[in-house]
A protein has these predicted regions:
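Flexible, compositionally biased loop and terminal segments
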Residues: 1-216
């Protein structure tokens, strides 16, 4: 790690748009599902590397609200991959805590299969180490949907008389984000060559740097 820049120049939070798996598989004559299997392996490697270099948080865009439009067999394969990963994460959560990082599943979890909802809840421990790294796994996530979620929370406070509409601030909206309490992403990476955010961390990425590359 000696080639890393000084800590003050290191990002605190990196977001990664996990796409390009299907094309990777196609170019190698493999089924799209195999691309997702390999992507899951890379996810674990990157997560460990982020921990080793001292990041505060990483957010992985694993499954968007728009991904339900994909072929049913591909969705089924993805749900199986998520099930296997979260099962493993649940079994190793205390070991992971000792290593110094915590898993969070963010997004509209209620839209996932019930088995995944239960695993997502069980695999995520309450954070007892403020110096640990947080890994956000974004499932059934959409940036616009997240903003709507935050606004709904604010509207509920206004309805109850807990907040005056004139006092609503950016901080109130940020507090309703799934990533509340974490620094906004300094850097967002998309490795597929696509030059767009695709509804990822829409609110939080206002001042992010972007790295788009084609490494498939």
């Amino acid at each position: 790690m000696s080639n890393l820049p000084p800590k003050e120049f290191m990002p605190k939070h990196i977001g990664i748009i996990m796409d390009g798996n299907g094309r990777w598989a196609r170019e190698r004559g493999l089924p799209r599902t195999e691309g997702h299997v390999q992507g899951a392996k890379v996810f674990k490697q990157i997560m460990d590397y982020g921990h080793d270099i001292g990041l505060e948080a990483m957010t992985f865009y694993a499954f968007s609200t728009e991904n339900w439009k994909r072929p049913k067999d591909e969705i089924k394969a993805l749900m199986q991959i998520f099930h296997e990963y979260l099962t493993e994460a649940d079994e190793t959560k205390y070991e992971r805590e000792k290593r110094g990082f915590y898993l969070r599943v963010i997004g509209d979890v209620s839209g996932l299969p019930m088995t995944l909802q239960l695993l997502a809840k069980s695999a995520c421990l309450a954070m007892n180490n403020k110096d640990a790294m947080v890994v956000n796994m974004a499932l059934n996530y959409g940036g616009r949907q997240e903003i709507v979620h935050a606004v709904q929370q604010i509207a509920e406070k206004v309805k109850k008389g807990e907040l005056d509409p004139k006092d609503i601030s950016e901080d109130d909206i940020s507090a309703g984000m799934y990533t509340a309490g974490l620094p906004d992403p300094d850097l967002i990476i998309r490795p597929s060559g696509e030059l767009r955010l695709s509804n990822f961390l829409t609110w939080q990425s206002a001042y992010s740097e972007f790295w788009f590359d084609d490494i498939a």
